């Protein structure tokens, strides 16, 4: 019986990414697979695919878990598991080494705050410098009032605004991670959408963009806008107001949270945010939905007690 050719796990995993994932998943997801490959190369450069056991695989996860939280270890496990299951189905390994894997990890660090309450948001918006052409502050105003993703907001041109009907058309994003930038498709089909804006925001941006051509980008001018720079500006404003800082994505969460708390339906919120389905919205904002359910329960009990 001929001997199996020795194949290193890291080499198989790299080839598996190229064959099965490249061109099939988003660039961000693909980068996560390559990051998993980088960690695997550091942790287990000499582990062979032919002889990998459950013990070997568990040791890889345990080593990774020493410096990462449990959720991150779970993501690492899912990335590797897909390749090993395929290897098992192809007969390259005799059994599934990922079976009954135990996911460990460092103690989770204190969760950063995700959103502002309504009072804090009002203070935040008042603090924005809208009397100048400071692109970042105008960007923050737009995201706070629309819930757009950072890349969606950066991808807006003047012609995406319909000031007469007070709407914004979202059909593309801006690749802010690349030095040269460039337009990219939206995150999913549901992210292509037209959303309503309030009359005040419409008037503000009508004035702000009056000197721009229809195809001019609104926020990206002669230099790149970094996510970190925007987050730093948010942090500066929050500290001035004695508010715990959030991120630019936290402004999107703030927008959605306020809509939920004012009784807007999950279906309408999912459509406005560009979520693929309502499940995504429900899972993301479960804590707020549960808070509302508790408030409703209290109202019901108080009402019944009065009968």
Task: Give short role names for the model-derived ranges.
Residues 3, 7, 50, 93-95, ...:
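DNA breakage-rejoining catalytic core of tyrosine-based enzymes
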Residues 5-13, 17-92, 131-132, 224-228, ...:
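N-terminal core-binding DNA-recognition domain of tyrosine site-specific recombinases/integrases
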Residues 74, 89, 93-154, 164:
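Basic, Lys/Arg- and aromatic-enriched nucleic-acid-binding interface segment
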Residues 88-97, 163-166, 172, 207-215:
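Proline-centered turn/helix-capping motifs that create local helix->coil transitions or kinks
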Residues 89, 141, 145-148, 152, ...:
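C-terminal catalytic core of tyrosine-transesterase DNA break-rejoin enzymes
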Residues 124-127, 179-184, 283, 287-307:
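DNA/chromatin major-groove-contacting recognition/catalytic segments
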Residues 155-207:
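Conserved tyrosine-mediated DNA breakage-rejoining catalytic core shared by Y-recombinases
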Residues 198-243:
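Active-site/catalytic core of tyrosine-dependent DNA strand-transfer enzymes
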């Amino acid at each position: 019986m001929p001997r199996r050719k020795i194949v290193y796990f890291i080499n198989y995993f790299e080839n598996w990414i190229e064959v099965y994932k490249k061109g099939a998943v988003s660039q961000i997801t693909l980068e996560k697979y390559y990051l998993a490959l980088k960690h695997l190369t550091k942790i287990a450069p000499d582990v062979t695919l032919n002889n990998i056991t459950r013990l070997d695989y568990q040791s890889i996860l345990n080593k990774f878990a020493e410096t990462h939280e449990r959720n991150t270890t779970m993501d690492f496990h899912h990335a590797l598991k897909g390749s090993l299951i395929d290897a098992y189905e192809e007969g390259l390994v005799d059994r599934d080494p990922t079976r009954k894997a135990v996911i460990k990890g460092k103690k989770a660090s204190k969760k950063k705050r995700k959103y502002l309450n309504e009072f804090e948001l009002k203070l935040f918006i008042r603090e924005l410098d809208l009397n100048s052409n400071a692109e970042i502050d105008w960007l923050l105003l737009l995201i706070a009032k629309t819930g757009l993703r950072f890349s969606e907001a950066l991808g807006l041109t003047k012609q995406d605004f319909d000031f007469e009907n007070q709407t914004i058309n979202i059909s593309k994003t801006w690749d802010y991670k690349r030095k040269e930038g460039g337009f990219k498709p939206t995150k999913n089909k549901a992210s292509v959408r037209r959303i309503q804006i309030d009359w005040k925001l419409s008037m503000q941006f009508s004035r702000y963009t009056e000197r721009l051509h229809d195809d001019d980008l609104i926020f990206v001018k002669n230099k790149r806008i970094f996510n970190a720079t925007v987050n730093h500006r948010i942090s500066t404003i929050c500290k001035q107001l004695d508010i715990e800082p959030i991120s630019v994505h936290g402004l999107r969460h703030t927008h959605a949270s306020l809509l939920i708390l004012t009784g807007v339906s999950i279906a309408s919120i999912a459509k406005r945010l560009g979520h693929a389905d309502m499940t995504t919205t429900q899972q993301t904002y479960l804590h707020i939905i549960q808070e509302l359910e508790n408030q409703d329960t209290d109202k019901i009990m108080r009402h019944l007690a009065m009968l």
